Amino acid sequence: MKFKKVISMALALCLLGGMTATASASTFTDAHGNVIELDDTLEAYANYDLVGADDAARMGETNLGDLWTDALRWFAASGKINEYFEEDDVTAGNTEIAVDADHIVALWNGGNLRADVPAGKFGEQQLAEVLPYPNAVAVAYMTGAQLVEALEAASQGLPYTEDTAAACASFMQVSGLKYTVDTAKEYDKGEAYGDNWFKAASLGRVTIDEVNGQPFDAEATYAVITSNANFKGMDSSYTFPAAAEENEKSTITTAVVRDVVWMYISEELGNVIGDDYAEAQGRIAIK
């Protein structure tokens, strides 16, 4: 369903051009109790409601999930990420993404999108409400086979029901790839992992249809841009730390995810979230 368009791009740009900056005075306390100072001078405009709050982003693809993951992939593919590697990484020669741009993808847990962004003007407060966690950007290098397993495990709660809502928190919004989940096939539960998940005993529910417009290669290496929480194995993400251990270039950067999303909105979208995000873009098919 396409969301109601509330303002034209031209009008939005005019409004943004006339906005007056004011001194920063707001703070936000995140889910870990950290008090974050917000810059009230930062403003952008969404032409459509950006939907991602908990249940919506656990059930399937959303336009906010597309935006969020696009920001992460852009951050890596553009080279912006190069300035945010830890000193130890730089010393070891890990100063840029080690694969071509067409092998960069981004994954983000639907349960880690906690609010919608209503159409209209918004600022840092709204992004903090979407992600009330101090997440950092991480890079995990995975083979195609590991990437399929990551998506298989992340989708184990589908189809979404009241009983599977907790397990569906791990469902992945994505950028740079298209995938299909066949819910007619039962998830093959292996070893229990955490409170709500199981490792995949076998694969078969998830198919990666393409990666950045190219055929998927199970043997290729992909750079998966995600959160430090996934990198460490949050929710169903047991494949992430395992893959990271196998590839020493996998790392957690100093970049804050919310800052990266804002950077994308500002530098790439010109502070206006327009028609490209009117609705989910068809990256995920759930059968």
What feature does the model see in each segment?
Residues 28-287:
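Catalytic centers of hydrolytic enzymes
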Residues 1-10:
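Bacterial Sec-dependent N-terminal signal peptides
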Residues 10-18:
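Bacterial N-terminal signal peptides
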Residues 17-29:
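Sec-dependent signal peptide cleavage junction
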